């Protein structure tokens, strides 16, 4: 996959944040963790992922450009925290107490599990499903899993199994 072109100023801002937070963590934890690799190959509605064994952070270039400073302030420390937790504690719950501690007490960033960015520009085709109380939009991956009989999804509000709304897909 080709690496998308990121404006140099955006990349520099990402790296400045990453280096500042890493230095802060190394001082607080009295460690010398190395700088992780950063790539801009994350796709879809996911803002970023931490690849633990590769010591790499993958960021979504579209969401970075659309939400610049908020993205840098929230997503970069979020993914760095995953790497630091893995290095310090090994395999633990992704957003568990160790991760929350790392975010709040070491990196001094609010521990938010998910971003609130608009994702219309990066969201792929969705399929409408219904329950007894509302409409749900499922990604193509989830829709295909339902079609193959691998899973079924339930509404969090009413608890009913979601049904594909064939009329809206025509």
UniProtKB/Swiss-Prot annotation:
<dbReference type="Pfam" id="PF10263">
    <property type="entry name" value="SprT-like"/>
</dbReference>
<feature type="domain" description="SprT-like">
    <location>
        <begin position="22"/>
        <end position="163"/>
    </location>
</feature>
<dbReference type="GO" id="GO:0008270">
    <property type="term" value="F:zinc ion binding"/>
</dbReference>
<keyword id="KW-0479">Metal-binding</keyword>
<dbReference type="GO" id="GO:0006950">
    <property type="term" value="P:response to stress"/>
</dbReference>
<dbReference type="InterPro" id="IPR006640">
    <property type="entry name" value="SprT-like_domain"/>
</dbReference>
<dbReference type="Pfam" id="PF17283">
    <property type="entry name" value="Zn_ribbon_SprT"/>
</dbReference>
<feature type="active site">
    <location>
        <position position="79"/>
    </location>
</feature>
<keyword id="KW-0862">Zinc</keyword>
<protein>
    <recommendedName>
        <fullName>Protein SprT</fullName>
    </recommendedName>
</protein>
<dbReference type="InterPro" id="IPR035240">
    <property type="entry name" value="SprT_Zn_ribbon"/>
</dbReference>
<comment type="similarity">
    <text>Belongs to the SprT family.</text>
</comment>
<feature type="binding site">
    <location>
        <position position="82"/>
    </location>
    <ligand>
        <name>Zn(2+)</name>
    </ligand>
</feature>
<feature type="binding site">
    <location>
        <position position="78"/>
    </location>
    <ligand>
        <name>Zn(2+)</name>
    </ligand>
</feature>
<dbReference type="InterPro" id="IPR023483">
    <property type="entry name" value="Uncharacterised_SprT"/>
</dbReference>
<keyword id="KW-0963">Cytoplasm</keyword>
<dbReference type="GO" id="GO:0005737">
    <property type="term" value="C:cytoplasm"/>
</dbReference>
């Amino acid at each position: 996959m080709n690496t998308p072109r990121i404006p140099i100023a955006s990349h520099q801002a990402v790296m400045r944040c990453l280096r500042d937070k890493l230095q802060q963590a190394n001082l607080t934890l009295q460690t010398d963790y190395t700088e992780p690799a950063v790539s801009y190959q994350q796709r879809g509605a996911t803002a970023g992922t931490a690849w633990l064994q590769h010591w790499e952070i993958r960021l979504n270039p579209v969401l970075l450009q659309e939400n610049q400073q908020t993205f840098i302030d929230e997503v970069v420390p979020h993914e760095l925290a995953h790497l630091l937790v893995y290095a310090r504690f090994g395999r633990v719950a992704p957003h568990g107490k160790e991760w929350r501690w790392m975010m709040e007490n070491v990196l001094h960033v609010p521990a938010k599990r998910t971003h609130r960015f608009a994702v219309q520009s990066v969201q792929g085709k969705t399929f409408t499903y219904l329950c007894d109380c509302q409409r749900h939009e499922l990604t193509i991956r989830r829709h295909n899993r339902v079609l193959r009989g691998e899973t079924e999804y339930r509404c969090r509000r009413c608890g009913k199994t979601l049904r594909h709304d064939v009329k809206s897909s025509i």
